A protein has these predicted regions:
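Conserved N-proximal alpha/beta basic substrate-recognition cap immediately N-terminal to
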Residues: 1-6, 11-21
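Coil-to-beta-strand transition motifs
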Residues: 2, 73, 82-83, 134-136, ...
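Short, solvent-exposed secondary-structure boundary motifs
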Residues: 6, 67-70, 130-132
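Phosphate-binding site of ATP-dependent enzymes
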Residues: 16, 20-116
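C-terminal active-site "lid" helix and adjoining low-complexity regulatory extension at the edge
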Residues: 112-123, 127-134, 143-181
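Hydrophobic residue at the +6 position relative to the catalytic HRD Asp in the kinase catalytic loop
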Residues: 139-141
């Protein structure tokens, strides 16, 4: 199986506070934004701070994913389309880059390159997608300094086209075949 950081999904502020005793990231589940009081917030994956931990009452109305922070040197963006697996490695040159590197996409601070996958890794992805009964998914992994791959999440509607096109991966052609056999 995959290495998975400790994770919980909760809308209980007390449970969330207890979980956040170690470096933790916070992810919205339903959408990347929420309303709290009279303000509207847009939230990428964010490292939990003392201020956020002290103000967790907003999660009562919308569960969140809390996940142990992985000190990463790269991210893997896996695009699964109808049995085919495309893997792009994303790195950044920004010192102290945000936990979520998506805002850096399309800038000179974010680089993508094809990542050579082992047959075992591809088989694990295919097995997971079969078990989840998904024909498409964008799957995120973090790579730590020891080279360990940490499974972060499966996005059944995640971003994929921009970076796969950028580095010459034929994911769009695979999607076309999937949708118009």
């Amino acid at each position: 199986g995959f290495c998975v950081p400790d994770s919980i999904i909760t809308n209980d502020p007390e449970e969330a506070k207890l979980f956040c005793q170690a470096p933790t990231v916070f992810k919205m589940l339903a959408k990347q934004s929420f309303e709290y009081g009279d303000k509207f917030y847009s939230v990428d994956t964010t490292l939990m701070t003392d201020e956020l931990i002290a103000n967790l009452s907003f999660i009562r109305s919308q569960p969140i994913l809390l996940q142990r922070c992985v000190e990463k040197i790269a991210e893997l963006r896996v695009t699964y389309v109808g049995g085919e697996v495309f893997v792009a490695k994303q790195t950044t040159s920004v010192e102290g880059a945000p936990v979520d590197w998506r805002p850096l996409q399309g800038t000179q601070d974010s680089m993508y390159e094809p990542w050579d996958t082992s047959p075992g890794f591809v088989a694990q992805i295919q097995s997971l997608m079969k078990r989840l009964n998904l024909k498409f998914a964008a799957i995120d992994f973090a790579v730590d300094s020891d080279g360990v791959l940490w499974f972060l999440e499966v996005n059944p509607n995640g971003q994929w086209l921009g970076y796969t096109d950028e580095i010459g991966m034929p994911a769009a052609a695979s999607m076309t075949r999937l949708l118009a056999p």
